[in-house]
Amino acid sequence: MENGTEGKNFYIPMNNRTGLVRSPYEYPQYYLADPWQFKLLGIYMFFLILTGFPINALTLVVTAQNKKLRQPLNFILVNLAVAGLIMVCFGFTVCIYSCMVGYFSLGPLGCTIEGFMATLGGQVSLWSLVVLAIERYIVVCKPMGSFKFTATHSAAGCAFTWIMASSCAVPPLVGWSRYIPEGIQVSCGPDYYTLAPGFNNESFVMYMFSCHFCVPVFTIFFTYGSLVMTVKAAAAQQQDSASTQKAEKEVTRMCFLMVLGFLLAWVPYASYAAWIFFNRGAAFSAMSMAIPSFFSKSSALFNPIIYILLNKQFRNCMLATIGMGGMVEDETSVSTSKTEVSTAA
């Protein structure tokens, strides 16, 4: 390609007329970015591990320890924490090492494994947010009447996230697209960059962008938008109720944070990947792709902060577990927490 160099199982966004391009599996890629930039990204990933792992792991611990957290509407939050742990353990650790040495030293097979696990975890996380939005929409807006969520419904929602995630992460393993190093060549993802014969990258990227980005975006905007409208309508009917007005503001704030968190994680990465795909051959720097790629990994940290730590019931249990606070046992607080779980937590 005019502005890049395609090799076996890799694509470097630099023309080899420079004579600098080397395999990202064998040589440091310091011609793509300064060594300190590699180290800085490695430090950033280390920060995500130090913060993301404890929060996600603690979510599983407190759920196992506290029966009151093991209610159907919380299943998807546990699923979200599992997705975060997959990203941290199987993606971030490998990425840190690659940043420190300056290239993806684990080879094509390691790249495929890392790319698959990172994509799987990221997609489970993404679809968990979709299922969570739908659950809240059903509970608050009641499009199905007085529908009662059971453990079976919630388990089906969790299973759905893994099915959808697998439908995105598995195809590159079996020849529909492939996993290659991206950005500064220290982490791996689907091939948005090349028209490599036999991989049908064009159809895969279009499928991934439409089904695994546009559909979730539309669903989340529709459900949370409907939720806010419903709560505002209820608040308008009870203008004299201070508690109702406060609840309306809280729900609006939480919905805003949820949508904002989703957009910050996925829009930069998906948009830039789409631009690369639809402007194939156009010049772009490795770092310009690395930044949105690395930023999307932040979802392993701020998703549990938004969806779990801001949930009073989970937060109280976590504080009690680490010895920094007691559970709020009075009936009013528990009732408030349960309402938060089903509406705006």
From Swiss-Prot:
Modification(s) after translation: Phosphorylated on some or all of the serine and threonine residues present in the C-terminal region.
Where is the protein found, in the record's own terms?
Membrane
* A molecular-function term among this protein's GO annotations: G protein-coupled photoreceptor activity
Q: In which tissues is it expressed?
A: The color pigments are found in the cone photoreceptor cells.
Which ranges does the record list as Extracellular topological domains?
A: 1-37, 101-114, 178-203, 278-285
Which Gene Ontology BP terms does the record give? cellular response to light stimulus; G protein-coupled receptor signaling pathway; phototransduction; visual perception
Glycan attachment residues as annotated in the record: N3, N16, N201
Span-the-membrane segments of this chain are: 38-62, 75-100, 115-134, 154-177, 204-231, 254-277, 286-310
Family (UniProt): Belongs to the G-protein coupled receptor 1 family. Opsin subfamily.
UniProt protein name: Green-sensitive opsin
